[in-house]
């Protein structure tokens, strides 16, 4: 399995050194009394920028006109991923932070949360409400079920991330604990809590998860992925 592109210490330094921002969108009435700095974007009567740059402009509104402020973070160190160049299907409501890698024809469903440093292989689906913690790695053509959690590891920096191989199916609401590796071709049953490494081509289930069988033709048929869902 591949190593993460950013190790824990690099992510820690990225966050520590990042300019912390409280990004806002402000709709206002009337006219601004002062010039708009280059750090703020003004489109008509709407301002986009960091609150520390926008707030002084609002204090100078002519005749104390009203304004409305929209914000979704405070002193954020990591922006959301710019998805425009990603060759994947990403549905509304997915929260994906910067420094995440997403392979071709992957699918990210509504409500999925993907933290900094995570890697998602080509053709892999991250289902509704699934969580990939910091530095979690999922291989190609895998499926992480709805509500499943791949625990993240950014601190302590010495800890190993979760690594999931190719052609793996992780059932709904399963939890994979920090540092665990899931071998290629394996299946994690719904609701399982995986606390130890899983070899290739087996089915694990339970709390804590145990191997219950090896992958057979019937299991492969039941867990086969649908390529049509990954068509762009």
Curated annotation (Swiss-Prot):
It comes from the Bacteria. GO terms for molecular function: tetrahydrodipicolinate N-acetyltransferase activity. Pathway: Amino-acid biosynthesis; L-lysine biosynthesis via DAP pathway; LL-2,6-diaminopimelate from (S)-tetrahydrodipicolinate (acetylase route): step 1/3. The keyword Cytoplasm does not apply. It is an enzyme of class 2 (transferase). It catalyses: (S)-2,3,4,5-tetrahydrodipicolinate + acetyl-CoA + H2O = L-2-acetamido-6-oxoheptanedioate + CoA. GO terms for biological process: diaminopimelate biosynthetic process; lysine biosynthetic process via diaminopimelate. Keywords: Acyltransferase, Amino-acid biosynthesis, Diaminopimelate biosynthesis, Lysine biosynthesis, Repeat, Transferase. It holds the Pfam family Hexapep_2. Catalyzes the transfer of an acetyl group from acetyl-CoA to tetrahydrodipicolinate. HAMAP family: DapH. Belongs to the transferase hexapeptide repeat family. DapH subfamily. This is 2,3,4,5-tetrahydropyridine-2,6-dicarboxylate N-acetyltransferase.
């Amino acid at each position: 399995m591949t190593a993460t592109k950013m190790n824990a210490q690099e992510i820690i330094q990225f966050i520590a050194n990042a300019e912390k921002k409280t990004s806002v969108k402000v709709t206002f009435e009337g006219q601004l009394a002062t010039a708009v700095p280059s750090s703020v974007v003004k489109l008509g009567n709407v301002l986009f920028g960091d609150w520390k740059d926008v707030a002084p402009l609002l204090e100078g509104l002519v005749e104390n006109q009203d304004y409305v402020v929209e914000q979704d973070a405070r002193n954020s160190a990591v922006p959301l991923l710019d998805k425009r160049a990603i060759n994947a299907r990403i549905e509304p409501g997915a929260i994906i932070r910067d420094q995440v890698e997403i392979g071709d024809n992957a699918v990210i469903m509504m409500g999925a949360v993907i933290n900094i440093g995570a890697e998602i292989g080509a053709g892999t689906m991250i289902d509704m409400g699934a969580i990939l913690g910091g530095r979690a790695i999922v291989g190609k053509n895998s499926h992480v079920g709805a509500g499943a959690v791949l625990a993240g590891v950014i601190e302590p920096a010495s800890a190993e991330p979760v690594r999931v191989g190719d052609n793996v199916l992780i059932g709904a609401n399963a939890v994979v604990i920090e540092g665990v590796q899931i071998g290629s071709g394996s299946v994690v049953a719904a609701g399982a809590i995986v606390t130890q490494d899983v070899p290739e081509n087996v089915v694990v289930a339970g709390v804590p998860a145990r191997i219950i069988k090896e992958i057979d033709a019937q299991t492969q048929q039941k867990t086969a992925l649908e390529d049509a869902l990954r068509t762009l």
